[in-house]
Amino acid sequence: MIHRTNYQQLRIGLASPEQIRSWAERELPNGDVIGQVDQPYTLHYKTHKPERDGLFCERIFGPTKSGVCACGNCRSVNDEGESSRFCKHCGVEFTDSRVRRYRMGYIKLACPVTHVWFLKRIPSYIANLLAKPLKELESLVYCDLFLARPVAERPALLRLRGLFNYEDRAWRNILPTFFSTQNYEMLRKNEIVTGGDAIREGLASLDLQSFLNCAYLEWQASVKQKPVGIEWEDRTIRRRKDLLIRRIKLAKDFLRTNMKPEWMVLYFIPVLPPELRPIVELHEGELITSDLNELYRKIIYRNNTLREFLSGSEFTPEGLIVCQKRLVQEAVDALIGSGIRGQPMRDIHNRPYKSFSEVIEGKEGRFRENLLGKRVDYSGRSVIVVGPSLSLHQCGLPREMAIELFQAFVIRNLIGRHLACNLRAAKCMIRKGNPIIWEVLREVMRGHPVLLNRAPTLHRLGIQAFQPLLIEGRAIRLHPLVRGGFNADFDGDQMAVHVPLSVEAQIEARLLMFSHLNLLSPATGDPVSVPSQDMLLGLYALTIESRQGIYRNRHLGFIDRVNVYSTKLLHFSSYCDLLRAKESRQVDSHSLLWLRWKIDLQIISSKIRELSSESHYESSGTSFHFYENCRIRKCRDGSISSMYVLTTAGRILFNQQLKEAMQGVSKNSFSYTTSSTLSTSTIDRCNTNSNNEE
């Protein structure tokens, strides 16, 4: 059994035939070696007890009842002594029945078969290593083609090379007349091969280091090769480069992990523990079983038939043996990955079997459903909605969820402040909703961050830390700018809330995981907290002029750009005057106005350096220069004495909010702008300026 205290990580890789066998094989005190499943039976049709050496054998997988053997004898599980722990008649161990959840068996195949994951998946690892087309390899695996293999340092009688079709050869019916059956079989085994044997020999003959060196040299030569200008030739060169890169990566992985390519061909099939593929008895006495049991039975039936054919090969036609090898390969394919690039195997009711791949893959598979998707304490889940009034590092938690998540902390606080005498009294106060509870909860939440996670967690920004705030309702509220990191939308998406318990977890959340510290993508460095959708529309509506867009048709008395200087517009000397006028409803967000601008600030517009459209000079030497968006008053010496910009109240409010939100950035980065959106380039510039200041 795997104990979580002994193992800190899990690595998935290829297993050698000896390792697969060692998973299940063990020796009894009487010297018998058990573990091999060689009978296709499951339960006896009358007694419903496991059959010996079958798929539910108690000798191999353990007793169905704790301390009870197949004979019905009972003995304590804690009895000491090797001989007393086994029944001498049936060989069943007197142990806990829970061992049937992790004890495995194995099926010894009469012929090697190719693992369908490494053959038919895209990209095909076997095809990449052998540098052969996938269709040819599939024909070889399923015994449609044969491969010539002359014995080393011996002359080849048939003079065959490469792949060929056995049925098309004329000598197939001539040679048996000149050789005895035994000699002809020996000749055939030395000269030709098909099925998993051919794939295993090809993979075993690879020298990975020399293979890697040759592939690397060829890739270097192809990189130096220039395009010839012909489309199909250039495409062929690119495909060859991609193939070489895949082969180099694959060879490096095999060398790094000390795994052998021939392990992709199976000699032993591991049999899952019975509790993971159960047979359930219904009330009427009927039995329902897992599809894996039926697939295992097919493999054992076909494998036993092939073993009988091979044991009497002198009298068995060659075509029958080849056909049976193909059936064994198809049965193993159906068990591991039914329907990969083909039709799945079906039962008598035309229902496709559920293979091992379908059991472990997908959202409802073994990994995501049972291992990664476990329910954990101090967590909750709810729908997310937008919270525009929140700060970037804040989230709104419903009161009902927050009191459940922080109940232990609230109880400790109540008892520590002598507001409750014991645990029962504190829980009673929480259940009744005493008003003091919410004050204590706010105090607890003030110093405790929470983690928000949206599945699937594809990158680091899929889980971030926030400062929780109590809100009404039953939905979690988020600042609209943080949705980019989660790849979430406010259209019904759900997010999980986790409470970090240890001090180390809380420190990590505050220093590394807070949302305002994760504004850039860790993969590309691009900003992820950028306005989109309704935020862009709101910024557009805030910064639009009364003579533009939808307001052009709504307000008939709009001002033309030509007579803007001849029209009487409101003048304001500061932002505070404008704010007071806005609060008293003297101006709206879209009305044009003149605002006195500080001379030491720069306008983010190059038009101030252009020629003025009109200039007025006074006898005192002062001059007025009129531009498209501003007017400047200069002294006699040419210095600027005052400057007014043409803008709207909405733009000024947006610009001021932008400056206050980015106080740590250089003031030059946030001068007045007429842009209606906070673009990604603005955030890039702000980030660059802040880095320069640091």
UniProtKB/Swiss-Prot annotation:
One annotated Gene Ontology cellular component of this protein: DNA-directed RNA polymerase complex
Its keywords, alphabetically, are: Chloroplast, DNA-directed RNA polymerase, Magnesium, Metal-binding, Nucleotidyltransferase, Plastid, Transcription, Transferase, Zinc
**Oligomeric and partner information:** In plastids the minimal PEP RNA polymerase catalytic core is composed of four subunits: alpha, beta, beta', and beta''. When a (nuclear-encoded) sigma factor is associated with the core the holoenzyme is formed, which can initiate transcription.
Q: What is the lineage of its organism?
A: Eukaryota, Viridiplantae, Streptophyta, Embryophyta, Tracheophyta
**Major location category of this protein:** plastid
UniProt entry tagged with the keyword Iron-sulfur = no
Q: Which reaction does it catalyse?
A: RNA(n) + a ribonucleoside 5'-triphosphate = RNA(n+1) + diphosphate
What the record notes about the co-factor is: Binds 1 Mg(2+) ion per subunit.
Listed GO biological process terms: DNA-templated transcription
Top EC class for this record: transferase
Family classification: Belongs to the RNA polymerase beta' chain family. RpoC1 subfamily.
Write down the required cofactor(s).
Answer: Mg(2+); Zn(2+)
- Specify the superkingdom: Eukaryota
Quote the Pfam families the UniProt record gives.
RNA_pol_Rpb1_1 (PF04997), RNA_pol_Rpb1_2 (PF00623), RNA_pol_Rpb1_3 (PF04983)
Q: Which SUPFAM superfamilies match?
A: beta and beta-prime subunits of DNA dependent RNA-polymerase (SSF64484)
Q: What is its EC number?
A: 2.7.7.6
* Protein name as catalogued: DNA-directed RNA polymerase subunit beta'
Stored PANTHER family:
DNA-DIRECTED RNA POLYMERASE, DNA-DIRECTED RNA POLYMERASE SUBUNIT BETA
Q: Where in the cell is it found?
A: Plastid, Chloroplast
Q: Name one GO molecular function term.
A: magnesium ion binding
Record keyword Transcription present: yes
The record's function comment reads: DNA-dependent RNA polymerase catalyzes the transcription of DNA into RNA using the four ribonucleoside triphosphates as substrates.
SMART domains, from UniProt? RPOLA_N
The UniProt annotation places Zn(2+) binding at 69, 71, 87, 90
Residue sites binding Mg(2+) per the record: 489, 491, 493
Tell me which InterPro entries the record gives: DNA-dir_RpoC_beta_prime, RNA_pol_asu, RNA_pol_N, RNA_pol_Rpb1_1, RNA_pol_Rpb1_3, RNA_pol_Rpb1_3_sf, RNA_pol_Rpb1_clamp_domain, RNApol_RpoC1
